[in-house]
Amino acid sequence: MQATDVIADMLTRIRNACSAKHETVDIPASNIKRAIANILLEEGYIKGIEEIDDGKQGVLRLKLKYTANKQNVISGLKRISKPGLRVYAGKSEIPKVLGGLGIAIISTSKGIMTDKKARAEGVGGEVLAFVW
């Protein structure tokens, strides 16, 4: 299956796996998905990332994280900038997710980063997604 919006496909796979309480979720690999997965790992939303070589583009296996009483650590994922309607934010307009409790994933000229890092670097860019 070929997805037209690979980031939305990734977020949907993670959301569905969390709802079903799966331990892992497999996502077809790409550089942008790898960068988003690394941000989720650094921010503590997932436990780990494993790269599997399948002879084609590869697969990212994300190890999902739950609290002690089996509640999802990721309570929400939302795609913001879509192929049909791109959303950009200047360095002074970078949104805060839930008053700073969540993260915004931003694609900048210096790479893909969180909203906090983009503010610190003084760069704006395309607002890819919100995670909370």
Swiss-Prot record:
GO molecular function, one term: structural constituent of ribosome
Keywords noted in UniProt: Ribonucleoprotein, Ribosomal protein, RNA-binding, rRNA-binding
GO CC annotation: ribonucleoprotein complex; ribosome
Annotated Pfam families: Ribosomal_S8
Bilayer-spanning residue ranges: none
InterPro entries referenced in this protein's UniProt entry, alphabetically: Ribosomal_uS8, Ribosomal_uS8_CS, Ribosomal_uS8_sf
Any GO BP annotation: translation
Family: Belongs to the universal ribosomal protein uS8 family.
Cross-referenced PANTHER family: 40S RIBOSOMAL PROTEIN S15A (PTHR11758)
Biological role stated in the UniProt entry: One of the primary rRNA binding proteins, it binds directly to 16S rRNA central domain where it helps coordinate assembly of the platform of the 30S subunit.
Assembly behavior: Part of the 30S ribosomal subunit. Contacts proteins S5 and S12.
Name of this protein: Small ribosomal subunit protein uS8
Organism for this UniProt entry: Acetivibrio thermocellus (strain ATCC 27405 / DSM 1237 / JCM 9322 / NBRC 103400 / NCIMB 10682 / NRRL B-4536 / VPI 7372) (Clostridium thermocellum)
Gene behind this protein: rpsH
